[in-house]
């Protein structure tokens, strides 16, 4: 471990890979595991029990692994698991879980920008972007390649579908369908995330299938959700993977979805 500064606190139970770089005024708490290639710039706090994979980078005043901000939490053992190659910019905060034995999970290749927050028990996928001041309350699930724009706020237990985008300053209290864009206060579904899908290499058939889902669920006001799903299941794109994913997402949504 390369200790860049002498003014730091590293607890005896911390497990730190040999090539981790730790800057001045950092705190590495009890039962923290830091994998190879991690870099902690100055004034970083990581507490445990928590584990971090390889290649993670922590900028000044980022704080990860502290106890949940939940009044019912009474000190039970909970965890934070972080994958590889994530970036936590200044003042980003990630909390451990609330329920005994629970785990907050962050996947790989995610970017958490200035002053964003992921609360207790969040389940964050891969290649996700939390823009500045974006906040996710407890138990929020965020799918791969989703983008949360600046200053948005996501209600607890909401699911954000993969390849979706939440607009700046949106108030999200219901689920966000995969491949869609929501914005507003409260958030409503505005369109298909066509540009995002194109950038990720989705086919024209995928785009057409998702656009049809959007029209059935949001444009055609004469259809109930149940009727729209039936038409999608019997459409020419019924076997398309994106369509199947949207149908399943709607069927399993517990909070309803942004209209």
What are these regions (language model features)?
Residues 6-7, 18-19, 55, 61, ...:
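Terminal amphipathic alpha-helical/low-complexity segments used for targeting or macromolecular assembly
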